[in-house]
Amino acid sequence: MVSALKCSLAVAVMISLACSAYAIKCYQCESLTMPKCGLKFEADETLLLDCSRIGPPRYLQNFFPLRNATGCMKKTLESVAGHPQIVRSCYFGDINNIQAGCQSDPSMPFVKQLGCDVCTKDECNGSSSLAPIAGAILLFFGVARLLA
């Protein structure tokens, strides 16, 4: 009975850590409505979004239905007026082939996309993406050692 309880506890710890390890947080903003989101970015906690809580944009849902975000992105767009606009958001798609995930929104035909940068770290500027996984593995072995 005790070993079954220990095993259940270890599995529960691993599941909760695995879920948190794959959730990525990205900044979500547009420089058109929020100047601090522009080229001179001013980090702000209120702009952070847990990407596991949202799905891909409508125009990408045919390509990535019910898929979790795989990274963060920063798109540089040129509006009709010719001014550069920065859009920061969660990225949905293959990190190794960003062409599909970075495609332009077809509902905005007059906006030209100048660039799309993709990264796989929280907030695109901080902790290594392997750090949460490595921590989860170490914690699992620590719990297993205690329960043994």
UniProtKB/Swiss-Prot annotation:
<dbReference type="GO" id="GO:0030431">
    <property type="term" value="P:sleep"/>
</dbReference>
<keyword id="KW-1003">Cell membrane</keyword>
<feature type="glycosylation site" description="N-linked (GlcNAc...) asparagine">
    <location>
        <position position="125"/>
    </location>
</feature>
<comment type="function">
    <text>Necessary for the maintenance of persistent fluctuating activities and suppression of acute evoked activities in abdominal leucokinin-producing (ABLK) neurons to negatively regulate neuron excitability involved in nociceptive (perception of pain) behavioral responses.</text>
</comment>
<keyword id="KW-0966">Cell projection</keyword>
<keyword id="KW-1133">Transmembrane helix</keyword>
<dbReference type="GO" id="GO:0032589">
    <property type="term" value="C:neuron projection membrane"/>
</dbReference>
<dbReference type="GO" id="GO:0043204">
    <property type="term" value="C:perikaryon"/>
</dbReference>
<dbReference type="Pfam" id="PF17064">
    <property type="entry name" value="QVR"/>
</dbReference>
<dbReference type="GO" id="GO:0032222">
    <property type="term" value="P:regulation of synaptic transmission, cholinergic"/>
</dbReference>
<feature type="transmembrane region" description="Helical">
    <location>
        <begin position="128"/>
        <end position="148"/>
    </location>
</feature>
<protein>
    <recommendedName>
        <fullName>UPAR/Ly6 domain-containing protein bero</fullName>
    </recommendedName>
</protein>
<keyword id="KW-1015">Disulfide bond</keyword>
<keyword id="KW-0325">Glycoprotein</keyword>
<dbReference type="GO" id="GO:0098552">
    <property type="term" value="C:side of membrane"/>
</dbReference>
<feature type="glycosylation site" description="N-linked (GlcNAc...) asparagine">
    <location>
        <position position="68"/>
    </location>
</feature>
<feature type="disulfide bond">
    <location>
        <begin position="119"/>
        <end position="124"/>
    </location>
</feature>
<feature type="lipid moiety-binding region" description="GPI-anchor amidated asparagine">
    <location>
        <position position="125"/>
    </location>
</feature>
<feature type="disulfide bond">
    <location>
        <begin position="51"/>
        <end position="90"/>
    </location>
</feature>
<feature type="propeptide" description="Removed in mature form">
    <location>
        <begin position="126"/>
        <end position="148"/>
    </location>
</feature>
<feature type="disulfide bond">
    <location>
        <begin position="26"/>
        <end position="72"/>
    </location>
</feature>
<keyword id="KW-0732">Signal</keyword>
<dbReference type="GO" id="GO:0032809">
    <property type="term" value="C:neuronal cell body membrane"/>
</dbReference>
<feature type="disulfide bond">
    <location>
        <begin position="102"/>
        <end position="116"/>
    </location>
</feature>
<keyword id="KW-0812">Transmembrane</keyword>
<dbReference type="GO" id="GO:0016020">
    <property type="term" value="C:membrane"/>
</dbReference>
<dbReference type="InterPro" id="IPR050975">
    <property type="entry name" value="Sleep_regulator"/>
</dbReference>
<dbReference type="InterPro" id="IPR031424">
    <property type="entry name" value="QVR-like"/>
</dbReference>
<keyword id="KW-0472">Membrane</keyword>
<comment type="similarity">
    <text>Belongs to the quiver family.</text>
</comment>
<feature type="signal peptide">
    <location>
        <begin position="1"/>
        <end position="23"/>
    </location>
</feature>
<feature type="disulfide bond">
    <location>
        <begin position="29"/>
        <end position="37"/>
    </location>
</feature>
<keyword id="KW-0449">Lipoprotein</keyword>
<dbReference type="GO" id="GO:1904057">
    <property type="term" value="P:negative regulation of sensory perception of pain"/>
</dbReference>
<keyword id="KW-0336">GPI-anchor</keyword>
<dbReference type="GO" id="GO:0005886">
    <property type="term" value="C:plasma membrane"/>
</dbReference>
